[in-house]
């Protein structure tokens, strides 16, 4: 387990090298599917995408059709309310050709979604988790204050945060 990492408190253990699928929106369907499958054959099991990454989910869905249970897929929603959360989740499930998403993340929200905050986002995520549509709830953010709040809340199983030596935070 030398090059393995456990994702937050999910219990998911994968190779520390994951596949960030934002760039595959810039290449053809055929090339993207080939690249994702090649990464899988090379031992990559964690694939990260988002609704905002145009057709990235569709390309991963095709790439892993038939081997879905052998990979971990994370995707994200930028929804600001429960109604849009459900729309995004159903679209992601259809695009990814799956009945569940391993890690569903709030994508860089301006605030930390919490129960009772009026947005309904966290409640929707919990309901989706109870229904088996998502397995784990995470948050991605570029704001240190929101990231700290997410950690301190204890509500999130993962936090995806960019680190940079040249950042002021």
Per-segment meaning from a language model:
Residues 1-71:
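N-terminal binding-site loop/beta-alpha segment at the start of enzyme catalytic domains
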Residues 6, 14-18, 45-46, 70-74, ...:
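Structural preference for beta-strand elements that scaffold enzyme active sites
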Residues 18-30, 74-84, 110-112:
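Active-site mouth loops of central-metabolism enzymes
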Residues 22, 50-52, 76-80, 106-109, ...:
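Active-site beta-loop-alpha junctions enriched in small/polar residues
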Residues 56-65, 85-97, 114-122, 143-155:
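Distinct, well-ordered alpha-helical segments
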Residues 58-76, 123-132:
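Alpha-helix-loop-beta-strand connector modules within alpha/beta enzyme cores
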Residues 109-169:
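Beta/alpha (TIM)-barrel catalytic core signal, keyed to glycine-rich beta->alpha loops juxtaposed to Asp/Glu
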